Amino acid sequence: MRILILNPPHPAIGSRIPKEQLPPLGLLSIGGPLLDAGHDVTLLDAEFGPLTDSEIVERVCAHCPQLLLIGHSGSTSAHPIVCRLTLFLRERLPNLIIVYGGVFPTYHFHDILTKEPQIDFIVRGEGEATVAKLIAALENHNDLNKVDGIAFRRDEQIIETLPAPMIQDLDVYRVGWELVDLKKYSYYGGKQAVVIQFSRGCPHLCNYCGQRGFWARWRHRDPKKFAQEIVWLHRTHGVQLFNLADENPTVNKAIWQEFCEAIIAENISITIIGSTRADDIVRDADILHLYRRAGVERFLLGMENTNEATLKHIRKGSKTSTDREAIRLLRQHNILSLATWVTDFEEVRDRDFIQALKQLLYYDPDQIMSLYVTPHRWTSFYGIASERRVIQLDQTKWDYKHQVLAATHMPPWRIFLWVKLIEILLQTRPKALWRLLFQPNKASRRGMYWFTLMGRRVLVHELINFFFGDRRVKNGPTLQEFWGMPQEHQEIPLSITRK
């Protein structure tokens, strides 16, 4: 079958501000098995440019695919763009089969199939096996009810098949790297870069996380095979930077150590950045030198909040003392720390921001990223926040960088100014400037320069958009009225029983 995979353009700050793009790992992961099954597969990455709607439609029509696969890693905020593009494509290509996948459609499939008649199928959960089975069923005119992990319409009824089995062995399906020109992708200040995934899922129980349930359970690739893929990408394609897509790659100390040692044995000079938990860093204090020798240059630490009571409320499972010790240990081993701090979990006041500033200064991270809580209805936090008022009705702004919920005691502008003030104070304090200017490690210094430059661009962009661009409502619907009933009981879309 002639298949086109479309990565739609995204207006989010992370997509537009850096002026660099990373390859769409999720779509490439779907493409690999389709290529191996003998299909004619092409990927159109509309993030470059970005392409306009008309340019995308013309390119898709010129290719004239039989089937279109569409999805985006920022699936909640990208959904309106997907709907708009597929509507245009349906008008031009009435016989095109349109298949939509990702985290957001996995949970909102009923709403989407009700409101968006141009979309034919939705893939729920992991797509590597499911998409290939769906296409085989379409080609052979088999019963679609027997394809696990999909949703579709039949006789004006929405059909949801059984959950697809969770992929037990992540090395079974390969990434279709040949679908893109890897030399076009860069990150972190011009380094040729890819997104790559060692593990899926997370064993922790944070009640606001929209990813944990989607992956069902934490699983990892074979550490030696994963290392060999990195070596191949570096030596064959010149990839310098590897951005880990994992929620938590360091869950298993022995497995992660095996990966680090496999990379070290290859004697290659690469940069690895990603996310992990502070308690893993503290646990691994005796092997952090292996992290650095393997190329780990920066880890994002999801601290989420500086208040112990809030951390307990959201089931983060960490302590502020552990967070600070993790940052200290990373610095001791010349690994940069990027601390994420999320506000608006609960009703906030000025004193909460003052306390947050004091605590973040105490943490002393190299870099900081402030986010706003963004509830998903398949998480248990959604039920907690369901009666809060929504102030942002534009779904493209539900990207963690925009306020979406009203606060009783503070207007949005004051929350915004507090968040920006904290960022500025953290990044311009003498200690931070000294590290920026006199960072002894050349590679780390370059990374800090790049992050600082991006921070300046983001600050200007956010100030202009908050006061002159974004539109908020004062008496919006409740969260439940906006998104619908909670789906906590459907948080895990995969079958975890071995077949």
Curated annotation (Swiss-Prot):
<protein>
    <recommendedName>
        <fullName>Anaerobic magnesium-protoporphyrin IX monomethyl ester cyclase</fullName>
        <ecNumber>1.21.98.3</ecNumber>
    </recommendedName>
</protein>
<dbReference type="InterPro" id="IPR051198">
    <property type="entry name" value="Tetrapyrrole_Bchl_Biosynth_MTs"/>
</dbReference>
<dbReference type="InterPro" id="IPR006158">
    <property type="entry name" value="Cobalamin-bd"/>
</dbReference>
<dbReference type="GO" id="GO:0046872">
    <property type="term" value="F:metal ion binding"/>
</dbReference>
<dbReference type="InterPro" id="IPR007197">
    <property type="entry name" value="rSAM"/>
</dbReference>
<comment type="function">
    <text>Involved in the tetrapyrrole biosynthetic pathways leading to chlorophyll and bacteriochlorophyll (BChl). Catalyzes the anaerobic formation of the isocyclic ring (E-ring) in Mg-protoporphyrin monomethyl ester (MPE) to yield protochlorophyllide a (PChlide a) via a six-electron oxidation and the formation of an oxo group at position C13 using oxygen from a water molecule.</text>
</comment>
<keyword id="KW-0846">Cobalamin</keyword>
<comment type="similarity">
    <text>Belongs to the BchE family.</text>
</comment>
<feature type="domain" description="Radical SAM core">
    <location>
        <begin position="188"/>
        <end position="420"/>
    </location>
</feature>
<keyword id="KW-0408">Iron</keyword>
<feature type="binding site">
    <location>
        <position position="202"/>
    </location>
    <ligand>
        <name>[4Fe-4S] cluster</name>
    </ligand>
</feature>
<dbReference type="InterPro" id="IPR013785">
    <property type="entry name" value="Aldolase_TIM"/>
</dbReference>
<keyword id="KW-0149">Chlorophyll biosynthesis</keyword>
<dbReference type="GO" id="GO:0031419">
    <property type="term" value="F:cobalamin binding"/>
</dbReference>
<keyword id="KW-0170">Cobalt</keyword>
<dbReference type="InterPro" id="IPR006638">
    <property type="entry name" value="Elp3/MiaA/NifB-like_rSAM"/>
</dbReference>
<dbReference type="GO" id="GO:0051539">
    <property type="term" value="F:4 iron, 4 sulfur cluster binding"/>
</dbReference>
<dbReference type="GO" id="GO:0016491">
    <property type="term" value="F:oxidoreductase activity"/>
</dbReference>
<keyword id="KW-0949">S-adenosyl-L-methionine</keyword>
<dbReference type="GO" id="GO:0036070">
    <property type="term" value="P:light-independent bacteriochlorophyll biosynthetic process"/>
</dbReference>
<keyword id="KW-0560">Oxidoreductase</keyword>
<keyword id="KW-0479">Metal-binding</keyword>
<feature type="binding site">
    <location>
        <position position="209"/>
    </location>
    <ligand>
        <name>[4Fe-4S] cluster</name>
    </ligand>
</feature>
<dbReference type="InterPro" id="IPR034466">
    <property type="entry name" value="Methyltransferase_Class_B"/>
</dbReference>
<comment type="pathway">
    <text>Porphyrin-containing compound metabolism; bacteriochlorophyll biosynthesis (light-independent).</text>
</comment>
<keyword id="KW-0004">4Fe-4S</keyword>
<dbReference type="Pfam" id="PF04055">
    <property type="entry name" value="Radical_SAM"/>
</dbReference>
<keyword id="KW-0602">Photosynthesis</keyword>
<feature type="binding site">
    <location>
        <position position="206"/>
    </location>
    <ligand>
        <name>[4Fe-4S] cluster</name>
    </ligand>
</feature>
<keyword id="KW-0411">Iron-sulfur</keyword>
<dbReference type="Pfam" id="PF02310">
    <property type="entry name" value="B12-binding"/>
</dbReference>
<feature type="domain" description="B12-binding">
    <location>
        <begin position="9"/>
        <end position="145"/>
    </location>
</feature>
<dbReference type="GO" id="GO:0015979">
    <property type="term" value="P:photosynthesis"/>
</dbReference>
